[in-house]
Amino acid sequence: MVEMLGVLAIVSILSIGGISAFQKAMTKHKINKTTEEFSQFINELLRYSKDLKRMHTNNETVEQAKIASSIEFFLPSTWRRQYENLYDSMNHRIYPFIRNDQTDVRHKYLSIDYHMPRGKDNTQFCIALYDMAKPYAEVIRKVFVYTKATESEQTKVQTAVWGTIDCKKNRKCLNDITLADMKRYCDTCDNEKEGCSFVLMFRL
């Protein structure tokens, strides 16, 4: 009887371990699939970069409402548009908009604000987004993470990392960041009441 109870206890522990491993594998698969879709979305945006640039006819920011309606036809099949908002398969909200450089209006940038609601996998997902961004270093101006616990709180911006062209002087280069760097930038994502946002700025 005692031996049987011991066997059952071992089976129970192994079952719990198996469930935990399965859950981790499913989370990793979901994150990989979602970042692949996001990369697909970025590729399409950059493909139409000249058209997007023409939308910016003055010094005003082109809001996401105008862009969202223009690009709906190439959204990944698991994404959806709801008014001016885009949502991916994990219900993360994506805000694309175009604006001038604050110091030189001749330069225009496509910004994508990728908002992750509060969740336990945000740090892991944020790290995956940094990895996804690296192949775009030649066309990226900068990448950064920001958090904001409440509407009344000041936005907390993590260290920006820079694309190849803009990585000068003492700036941190996107291609040079390590896993430890990414963890440091992303750690706050799991601690904020309102989640965090991953921002990419592309040169147009």
Regions of interest found by a model, annotated:
Residues 1-26, 34:
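N-terminal single-pass transmembrane signal-anchor helix
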Residues 6, 53, 72, 87-92:
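Glycine-centered flexibility motif
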Residues 14, 65-66, 71, 154, ...:
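Alpha-helical protein-protein interaction elements
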Residues 20-56:
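Membrane-proximal N-terminal amphipathic helix
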Residues 45-83:
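Short, glycine/small-hydrophobic-rich surface segments
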Residues 79-204:
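Intrinsically disordered, low-complexity regions enriched in Pro/Ser/Thr/Gly and acidic residues
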